[in-house]
């Protein structure tokens, strides 16, 4: 095994570990705010504007059925609203309400504060993160390119 291959394997293991811990941290932040990570994700994908459930599901990499369940919860708590879709009468657009936007803003503020503390504890600066991002994106591009 080459050194590069060994380092690649370690990187993959560390990325999985980082993603898992980050996900659990997000779940904790959401729970403390009386939300779920799933609701937070759907609110986040709607922050750019109204979307259909299938469109939101594609963006999140989830099934439309799972996103529909979360949207149902968000509709019940007035976090989102269904508005007519001029392009498809049977597939309404789901839009954030003012309450949904406020919830998303609170969650984002809590998350940003937690991430800032993490970066300070790790002693990591923006340039280190940019380099790591460039490396990961090059690997992703290579994996996505046939050959």
Across the structure, where does each feature detected by a protein language model lie?
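N-terminal leader segment of winged-helix/HTH proteins
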Residues: 1-33, 138
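C-terminal regulatory/oligomerization modules of transcriptional regulators
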Residues: 1-3, 124-147
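Short, locally clustered residues in the helix-turn-helix/winged-helix DNA-binding domain
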Residues: 16, 44-48, 108
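A structural signal for well-ordered alpha-helices, especially hydrophobic packing surfaces
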Residues: 19, 104, 140-144
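N-terminal helix-turn-helix DNA-binding core of bacterial DNA-binding proteins
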Residues: 25-66
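Charged, amphipathic alpha-helical coiled-coil/dimerization segments
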Residues: 72-131
């Amino acid at each position: 095994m080459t050194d590069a291959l060994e380092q690649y394997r370690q990187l993959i293991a560390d990325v999985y570990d980082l993603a898992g811990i980050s996900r659990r941290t997000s779940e904790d932040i959401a729970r403390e705010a009386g939300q779920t990570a799933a609701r937070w994700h759907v609110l986040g994908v709607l922050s750019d504007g109204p979307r259909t459930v299938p469109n939101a599901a594609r963006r999140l990499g989830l099934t439309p059925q799972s996103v529909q369940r979360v949207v149902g919860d968000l509709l019940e708590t007035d976090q989102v609203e269904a508005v007519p879709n001029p392009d498809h009468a049977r597939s309404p657009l789901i839009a954030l309400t003012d309450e949904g936007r406020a919830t998303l803003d609170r969650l984002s503020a809590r998350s940003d504060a937690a991430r800032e503390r993490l970066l300070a504890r790790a002693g990591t600066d923006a340039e280190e993160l940019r380099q790591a991002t460039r490396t990961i994106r090059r690997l992703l591009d290579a994996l996505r390119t046939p050959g």
